[in-house]
């Protein structure tokens, strides 16, 4: 039976796609392997915390004792290998979650050291902007170590991180809008080891946006104290309507919660308004959805490369 060409693709394009897919078979196999591992990890966490439909019901008002919300935060902590988690619809995006984490961990007079060059534009406004409420306006300092040929400059990081006033070392896992390679957890672990050697009390913070479930490990499992991201990206599985997360040391997550709500309230309040089910379902699907997104990007890059375009990453 002749198959219908619903999209009106030319025979050349269809053949290019087949050739690209055949070439990418070993890459797709590795992506599937990671997705299978992470799906098992998520399922094991669901079983350990006895997830049931009773956790899907939301709360209104203050949101005290929201069982579904509190359990989901425990699951996130387990998945990332941390002491605590903060998973909230109140985070409007990843930048908001990162901002709460930064302001929670840093005080006036402290210095944040970014070792992956400057953060992306929206977060940079939070850190160095002249707008009211920025870290700069609160007297929190900022320095950076630029990447060397697109990779971490461990020698420069060791020197800069040793300064007494550096209270946080910040890494951006994703390339963001820069032309560089994404950091692997292995590379993040190497940087963490360098920082620990010269400044053991510094908080190591990772912007994990777009990085969740792309490897078997997460940054907090290789030495980072805390990481944050958005639920409308990987961990939401395409189902979470909004929100963000922070995972890490209990004291750091608690301080971030105080920034999200108010000192003395922290994570005790925060109604979920019937959205818990989507957050759970999205997290369950997240490893698979993330894998499909990576496959699509790899496939598109290969087809464009076959057509003569320069692609990055290649």
In which residue ranges do the predicted regions lie?
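Conserved PLP-enzyme active-site core in the AAT-like
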Residues: 2-25, 32-33, 41-47, 52-55, ...
């Amino acid at each position: 039976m002749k198959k219908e060409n619903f999209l009106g693709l030319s025979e050349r394009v269809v053949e290019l796609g087949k050739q690209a897919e055949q070439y990418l078979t070993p890459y797709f196999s590795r992506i599937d392997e990671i997705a299978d591992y992470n799906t098992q990890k998520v399922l094991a966490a669901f079983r350990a915390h006895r997830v049931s439909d009773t956790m899907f019901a939301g709360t209104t008002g203050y949101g005290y004792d929201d069982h579904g919300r509190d359990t989901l935060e425990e699951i996130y902590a387990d998945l990332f290998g941390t002491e605590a988690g903060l998973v909230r619809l109140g985070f409007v995006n990843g930048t908001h979650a990162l901002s709460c984490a930064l302001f929670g961990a840093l005080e006036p007079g402290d210095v944040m050291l970014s070792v992956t060059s400057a953060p992306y534009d929206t977060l940079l406004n939070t850190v160095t902007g002249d707008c009211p409420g920025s870290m700069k306006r609160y007297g929190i300092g900022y320095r950076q170590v630029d990447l060397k040929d697109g990779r971490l400059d461990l020698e420069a990081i060791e020197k800069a991180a040793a300064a007494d006033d550096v209270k946080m070392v910040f890494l951006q896992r994703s390339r963001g809008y820069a032309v560089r390679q994404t950091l692997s957890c292995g590379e993040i672990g190497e940087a963490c080891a360098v920082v620990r050697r010269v400044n053991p009390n510094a908080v190591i913070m990772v912007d994990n946006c777009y990085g969740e479930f792309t490897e078997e490990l997460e940054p907090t499992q290789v030495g980072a104290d805390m990481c944050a991201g958005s639920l409308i990206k990987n961990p939401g599985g395409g189902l979470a309507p909004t929100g963000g997360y922070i995972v890490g040391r209990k004291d750091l997550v608690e301080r971030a919660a105080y920034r999200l709500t108010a000192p003395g309230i922290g994570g005790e309040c925060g109604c979920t308004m019937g959205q818990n089910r989507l957050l759970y379902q999205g997290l369950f699907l997240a490893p698979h959805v993330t894998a499909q997104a990576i496959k699509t990007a790899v496939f598109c890059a290969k087809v464009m490369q076959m057509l003569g375009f320069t692609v990055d990453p290649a």
